[in-house]
Amino acid sequence: GVPICGETCVGGTCNTPGCSCSWPVCTRN
């Protein structure tokens, strides 16, 4: 739903629950 999780994932991982890496930012449905 919310496209931006407020987290970047240049390293390849997201720490925010429910977010996945869509390089270079974390996204969620």
From Swiss-Prot:
Question: Where do we see the Cyclopeptide (Gly-Asn) cross-link in this protein?
Answer: 1-29
Instruction: State if Transmembrane is listed as a keyword.
Output: no
- What is the organism lineage in this UniProt record? Eukaryota, Viridiplantae, Streptophyta, Embryophyta, Tracheophyta
Tell me which family the UniProt entry assigns to this protein: Belongs to the cyclotide family. Moebius subfamily.
Q: Please verify whether the record's keywords include Ribosomal protein.
A: no
| InterPro entries, A to Z | Cyclotide, Cyclotide_moebius_CS, Cyclotide_sf
Which protein is depicted? Varv peptide C
Q: Which keywords label this protein?
A: Disulfide bond, Knottin, Plant defense
For this chain's UniProt record, which GO biological process terms are given?
defense response
| Pfam families membership | Cyclotide
